[in-house]
From Swiss-Prot:
Originating gene: TUB2
Organism field: Ajellomyces capsulatus (Darling's disease fungus)
Residues that, per the record, bind GTP: 11, 69, 138, 142-144, 205, 227
Name the UniProt record assigns to this protein: Tubulin beta chain
PANTHER family found in the cross-reference section: TUBULIN (PTHR11588)
Cofactor(s) in the UniProt record: Mg(2+)
Annotated positions binding Mg(2+): 69
Pfam family, one: Tubulin_C
Keyword match tRNA-binding: no
Length: 445
């Protein structure tokens, strides 16, 4: 089997990770103690991708949980699926990173990183044919951002030919910000992700808040509500990896379909229909409605309008009892209507996959992954906040005090600016110039 080792770091990573495991355990018929009580063969067919079968037919997640303080670990352990995880795979200390990227990456985090890599190595040895890693972290704090990116670079060194997918809560949002230095942390992290990640699924806290308040009509959304949305999207994105199917059935195939140039691997993700925690969708949803919602900014987990950019590639995963013909017809219709928003120099740049198992509580759903040049807005937003503070060297002493150099900040800033320019360049590219570069890259692969 093609296994995936999952890591979750920091408070945000561990809370979203716990919600993710609860969601996919339910879909595979695994209870809180790790025993299978489902009724469908399809649930077991690719169970080994995320779960390791231990003694007495108990299924244990291939998960490593990391934090620099014990609080979140304790709450994951005490949660409904806390007994699911291997106790040795909880790796934490008491120090904390104090929301400082430098502490997570260079001082506190670097003291713990070897211990984490040992656990990762043990998990990798339990795999028959490891396809890669996925890591969940936020980019605004200290542990998820600083130590998360350190782990990614260490895993890259140790397993250079395996895939690396990250689910990153990318954008610091004023609505949910709990620290002033988030723009620094996010920019320094993105600098690392551009080089070391193969595919990054971008999640924007502000978009999650808007969905909770406008679409789900929750007056005071909690982190639990936000995590529910993220776990629904993650479950959708990983559907092709966990259930039998042809399209994007492993991380490498997903990257080949979605990443036209190595640095442009930041994806926008969305989900339909959106429902709040514990609420089931009583309304009948149709395929035309799901395809329509794919191109609705209100269903995206990034606060961006795709109409400000162009799609390089896109992928849609439909779940439930849906007709392949109806899906393909609807996808073609929507594409024809919106053809100006797709670059014309990548032919057949929209892929569709079907899975017969719907998410819990829904008859039908669609998840969409889009590599759009509109994502540059997100980097610009963080870059502007970064520049405003860095120009005055505000809060810099918290980073230089941990041994960082100002040069690193300058490099991270220019790397982010380069990324924005690259997205803009391919947005403006015409069919002749774009095609040449695309085919050069395809041959190189």
């Amino acid at each position: 089997m093609r296994e995936i080792v999952h890591l979750q770091t920091g408070q945000c990573g561990n809370q979203i990770g716990a919600a993710f495991w609860q969601t996919i355990s339910g879909e595979h018929g695994v209870d809180g103690a790790g025993y299978y009580n489902g009724s469908l063969d399809i649930q077991l067919e690719r169970m080994n991708v995320y779960f390791n079968e231990a003694a007495e037919k108990k299924y244990v997640p291939r998960a490593v949980l990391v934090d620099l303080e014990p609080g979140t670990m304790d709450s994951v352990r005490a949660g409904p699926f806390g007994q699911l995880f291997r106790p040795d795979n909880f790796v934490f200390v008491q120090s904390g990173a104090g929301n400082t990227w430098a502490k997570g990456h260079y001082t506190e985090g670097s003291e713990l990183v070897d211990q984490v890599i040992d656990v990762v190595r043990r998990e990798a040895e339990r795999c028959d044919c490891l396809q890669g890693f996925q890591i969940i972290h936020s980019l605004g704090g200290g542990t998820g951002a600083g130590m998360g990116t350190l782990l990614i670079s260490k895993i890259r060194e140790e397993f250079p030919d395996r895939m690396m997918a990250t689910f990153s809560s990318v954008v610091p949002s004023p609505k949910v910000s709990d620290t002033v230095v988030e723009p620094y942390n996010a920019t320094l992290s993105n600098h690392q992700l551009v080089e070391n990640s193969d595919e990054t699924f971008c999640i924007d806290n502000e978009a999650l808040y808007d969905i909770c308040m406008r679409t789900l009509k929750l007056s005071e959304p909690s982190y639990g509500d936000l995590n529910h949305l993220v776990s629904a999207v993650m479950s959708g994105v990983t559907t092709c990896l966990r259930f039998p199917g042809q399209l994007n059935s492993d991380l490498r195939k997903l990257a080949v379909n979605m990443v036209p140039f190595p640095r442009l691997h930041f994806f926008m993700v969305g989900f339909a229909p959106l429902t709040s925690r514990g609420a089931y969708s009583f309304r009948v949803v149709t395929v035309p409605e799901l395809t329509q919602k794919m191109y609705d900014p209100k269903n995206m987990m990034c606060l961006l309008d795709f109409r400000n950019g162009r799609y390089l590639t896109a992928s849609a995963i439909f779940r439930g009892k849906v007709s392949m013909k109806e899906v393909e017809d609807q996808m073609r219709n929507v594409q024809n209507k919106n053809h100006t928003y797709f670059v014309e120099w990548i032919p057949n740049n929209v892929q569709t996959a079907l899975c017969s198992i719907p998410p819990r509580g829904l008859k039908m759903s669609s998840t969409f992954v889009e590599n759009s040049t509109a994502i540059q807005e997100l980097f610009k937003r963080v870059g502007d906040q970064f520049t405003a503070m860095f120009r005055r060297k505000a809060f810099l002493h918290w980073y230089t005090g941990e041994g960082m150099d100002e040069m690193e900040f300058t490099e991270a800033e220019s790397n982010m600016n380069d990324l924005v320019s690259e997205y803009q360049q391919y947005q403006d590219a015409s069919i002749s110039e774009g095609e040449d570069e695309y085919f050069d890259y395809a041959w190189a692969m």
